[in-house]
From Swiss-Prot:
It holds the Pfam family CBFD_NFYB_HMF. InterPro entries: CBFA_NFYB_domain, Histone-fold, Transcr_DNA_Rep_Reg. GO terms for cellular component: negative cofactor 2 complex; nucleus; RNA polymerase II transcription regulator complex. This is Dr1-associated corepressor. Belongs to the NC2 alpha/DRAP1 family. The gene is DRAP1. Gene3D superfamilies: Histone, subunit A.
Amino acid sequence: MPSKKKKYNARFPPARIKKIMQTDEEIGKVAAAVPVIISRALELFLESLLKKACQVTQSRNAKTMTTSHLKQCIELEQQFDFLKDLVASVPDMQGDGEDNHMDGDKGARRGRKPGSGGRKNGGMGTKSKDKKLSGTDSEQEDESEDTDTDGEEETSQPPPQASHPSAHFQSPPTPFLPFASTLPLPPAPPGPSAPDEEDEEDYDS
């Protein structure tokens, strides 16, 4: 069975280059060496462009090269002036302060990942961290009010869910007999309590 790993080959196909060249009506026959030379020139050009763009990316302490990095590289290097029209629509590079702010956001996102597990358990873990980070007492009070309301919403939601199944237990007692047998002694008294509930309904009406 042949191996699936292929050697990386960044060479541009001379046959494709020859076809592109021959689309121009002014070009007739093309010598065999010409597409090979153009292919190699294209490799060298891309290598120099990417090295310069990589330097720009590293100078910004970024891990991912973006179109903004390429644009800045093209604007800084005179040899790439002919590419300025291609990158005219690309947004400009952000300033150093904004970049540092973005890096801080990335760090904050990384910091929240462990807290995301806390959200599954009720969401209180990340909010308590936010309290520690906020500087003023008024902000902490606002956040504590938010957490209190969130807590009330969270606690108010589970009881209705719990009450719905209990309503099902009381209304059809026969299908739930096996489930009732697992409960301790209290299932026996519900028989007499059912008339009490009906009596209470009579009093209410």
